[in-house]
Amino acid sequence: MKLALLTYNMARHWDLPTLLAQAGEIGFEGVELRTDRDHAHGVEVTLSEEERAKVKEQAEASGVEICGLSSGCKYDALEEAELREHIDHTKALIDLCADVGAPGLKVFGNNFHEEAGVSRDETMAQVAEALRECARLAQPRGVEIRFEMHGDFNPWKYCVRVVELAEEPNVSLIYNCDGRDVQGGSIAEVWRHVAPYVRHVHLHDLTDSFPYRELFRLLKEAGYQGYTSAELPDSADPERVLRYYRALWETYVREAG
C-alpha cells in the first residue's frame, strides 16, 4: 500500500510545487487535492487546457502522483436544481481529473431527509442514480468515482447499498476510519462487508482511539495495493508532523506483516 497526503487542512497553504516537493522529500508517494476551497495548489475546474497540462507535467516530473481529487459534491439534495448543480460540477471535475492525471474523484452521499418526508430508500436511489450518471462519463476517461463512507451514509449498509444500486464498475468506496465502525474494539465486522468495494482509504490521526493496527492488518490480508491518504488537522510545523506521521505509518505497515 502507499501513503498520500490529502490537502483538506494540512498543506492547504502550499502551492503545487511546494506540495509536490515536500511530499516527495518526506516520503509520501501521492497527494490528494481538495478542490473548491481556494487552496494554494490551485488545481480547480477554472484552469485552462494549458494550465492543466502543466499541472500534470509538474506531478510527473516530481515523481509524486496526484492520486485523486477530493470534492464536496453530494447527491442528497431535495431540490432537483441543486442536485443537477452537483452532478454537473462532478462532470467538470471528472474532466479535470483526466486532464491532470488523477485517477479518482471523491464524492459524498451525504444526508438523509426523513424529516422532509423522503425515505432513506428514496435518497439512496437518488444518490445511486447520480453516481451512475457520473460514472458512465468517467469510465472512458479513466477516472474512478470514489464514494466516501461519510455523514448519514455510514453505517456501512447504506454506502454498500448505494454502490450496489449504482451498478457501475468504476464506482468504489473510500473507507474513512470512522469511530462508528468500531464494535467491541474491532472494525472486522464492518470491514467484512465493505472490503470488496474499497479502493481508497482516508486515514486520520494514527492514535489508539481507532484500531489502526487492525486496519493495516486487514488491508494487508486483503492484498490492498492502493493509497491511504492522510487527512490531518493543520499544524504550525507541518513538515515535522508529516515526518512523524510517515514513520508511524511505516511502523504500522511493517507490523501488519
State what each model feature region is.
Residues 1-4, 12-29, 53, 60-62, ...:
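Histidine-acidic metal/acid-base catalytic patches
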Residues 42-58:
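Glycine-rich, positively charged N-terminal anion/phosphate-binding segment
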Residues 21-24, 53-65, 75-173, 180-184, ...:
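Active-site acidic/histidine proton-transfer and metal-coordination neighborhood
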Residues 32, 68-70, 106, 146, ...:
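Conserved beta-strand positions in the central sheet of alpha/beta enzyme cores
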Residues 29-40:
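A short beta-strand-loop structural module common to alpha/beta enzyme folds
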